[in-house]
Amino acid sequence: MHQTHRFALPALAALALAACGKSEAPAAPAVAPTELAAIETPPPAYPIELACAGAGGQTVLKVTVGPEGTPTEVALVKSSGQTQLDQLAQEKVREWKFRAATRNGQPVAQTIQVPVDFKPPVPKPDECFAIEERAKRGG
């Protein structure tokens, strides 16, 4: 009799499951979107001649970061007032690395605006005085 009960329970469980009818596969869990994140964003070089002259400003760039995490487009939105600084900012930002934004678990392109600040050092570096002396002497 014990053996009958042992086989009856699994059979009843199978019948109960079959009676429930077809169950639909559970919906795939929604994957939360993630935003773009900076990984490696070193500042551009600040030419010492411009820094010593007190030339500075803020360059604003429109940057499209592709699914692979690198800038695919870089455009000037607002000039610092110094063409050389604007160009240096654009060149350096093209080298930056990001963790791409994701939608439904897949990396996607995203466009952001990036301000790049150039602030003259205070106090002036000693190198500035040497540059000024050379300029006074005509070379």
Stretch-by-stretch model annotation:
Residues 16-19:
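C-terminal motif of bacterial Sec signal peptides marking the signal peptidase cleavage site
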Residues 27-62, 88-126, 132-134, 138:
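Short proline/glycine- and basic residue-enriched helix-capping loop/turn segments at helix->loop/beta transitions
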Residues 1-10:
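Bacterial N-terminal signal peptides that target proteins for export
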Residues 78-83:
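A short acidic/small-residue loop/turn micro-motif
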